[in-house]
Amino acid sequence: MSDAPLIQAEGLVKNYGTLTVLRGIDLHIRREEIVAVVGPSGAGKSTLLHILGTVDKPDKGSLHYEQTDVMRLGDRELSRFRNRNIGFVYQQHQLLPEFSAHENVLLPAMIGDLQTRETDAYLDELFGLMGIKARAGHRPSQLSGGEQQRFAVARALINRPKVVLADEPSGNLDTYHARQLHELFFTLRDRYGQTFVIVTHNPELAARADRTLHLTDGQLGP
């Protein structure tokens, strides 16, 4: 794991009307680090993840990915940067029901015009590593909850991003499948070198993460 920060944020403030959700957040996240973000509901965890993912902007503060100041990017540049560098996983798998799991995984690469001749070989390896190769031709309704979420993770990885941001990814899974999904994050990190930032209420995942950030009332604490 490199000590050089992949993500560096300083003084992040986010307001919604008169409500201050983030209050001067400073953080750095290293390459290949798995970071858990924990805290009570309403603490600002999802808002922080949205800002780190560049889908929302802070009212104050700065955000750098290595040497790139993402706050200075125009809308088109920012969209391109996000497609290439950031993957997202949510509590709901958000797989489109009319497409097969394989087609769902490919969508971000197709939309971002990032599909190459190596994509199929990469997916074959990825599906094999995740234990879902035999299920890739099925539609989401034919899959178990654990399988659906694994394909959602594969979709987040399709463009080989530097970082994967996950918001309660195991929140809808039973204990067994939640543990399988958490184990998968570490396997993928070790194989492909991604950084994972995971909002979670799961104490096992928080304890196993390389580092845990505690967010309360919009502030990071010990």
Could you say what each language-model-derived stretch is?
Residues 1-3:
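Short, Lys/Arg-enriched, disordered terminal segments
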Residues 5-208, 212-215:
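ABC family nucleotide-binding domain
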